[in-house]
Amino acid sequence: SEMCIRDSNLKALGFNTVETYVPWNLHEKEEGTYDFSKILDLSHFLELAQSLGLYAIVRPAPYICAEWEFGGLPAWLLTKECRIRSTDPRFMKYVKRYYQTLLPKIVPHLVTHGGNVLMVQVENEYGSYGEEKAYLRQVKKYLEEGGINVPLFTSDGPWQATLRAGSLIDDDVFTTGNFGSKAKENFADMAQFFEAHGKKWPLMCMEFWDGWFNRWKEPIIKRDPEELADAVKEALQIGSINLYMFHGGTNFGFMNGCSARGTIDLPQVTSYDYDAPLDEQGNPTEKYFALKRMMAENFPEMQQMEPW
């Protein structure tokens, strides 16, 4: 399958873990009707990754961002009188109900049950949106009550303000940062935040942005492959990273999201090629081979193979 080939190409690069978001609005398009079939078969995705020798990281909503329609929240929530991404019980009851269907698909695949899922994310970059810790704690509680007993984590921009607002460091939830360059500076900021809270935690970039998304009426954004390889090398000498994206693919239908700048809407294009190491069709690019060369030179202990 295409999924198998793409995961194989990640393994071939010398990486050991695959990460995925879980878009609520695809799994519960219509209220109360769930779909985990075909390309939405999360269990199959995790089993496939494990069969290839890959660990997995799961980021299961409620909100995922990802330049995805409504950040992954189902459109039918807009017909409800509720405040999203908050402790509003009218919102959280739907999160809880969704988790009761979703989490049993993840729990058997946790490393604690012989599976490959290492970590699970609480919300997503909440520090860029709000600072209601009670909401984050409630999401954490629902994950734990649903049987998630691997490390939970948050991910936010690596700045003190966003880390303060979006992390649950005082609840011992692992804190990760999202950035695409200047690893030394960004990891130093994170280390400072950890130290201020009495933590000696490892440093991890949960989204190392290797390309960028594209909006209508704006030029296509490209990143030099060798410059990226150098930036990844710098990051890996200090901490761990998850490439965002390794493969971007396509926003089919109306799933392309829309951000805003002031009062101006900034809709995404249909393609989510992202100038990633695998192109929209899933083929290795120059960026892939630049990363592969860098990995072979600097991390020879990570076994590589020829890509498909």
Question: Model features per residue range: what roles?
Answer:
Residues 18, 47-71, 249:
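Glycine-rich, aromatic-flanked loop segments that form ligand/cofactor-binding clefts
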Residues 11-43, 64-70:
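Aromatic-lined carbohydrate-binding/catalytic grooves of carbohydrate-active enzymes
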Residues 80, 95-107, 113-121, 132-136, ...:
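Carbohydrate-binding surfaces of carbohydrate-active enzymes
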Residues 3-5:
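Short, small-residue-biased leader/transition segments that mark boundaries at the very start
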Residues 32-38, 51, 62-86, 136-141, ...:
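Aromatic- and acidic-residue-enriched segments that line the glycan-binding/catalytic groove
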Residues 38-58, 80-117:
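An active-site-proximal structural segment forming one wall of the substrate-binding cleft
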Residues 1, 24-41, 78-97, 121-132, ...:
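The substrate-binding groove and active-site-proximal loops of carbohydrate-active enzymes
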Residues 133-235:
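Noncatalytic carbohydrate-binding groove/subsite architecture in carbohydrate-active enzymes
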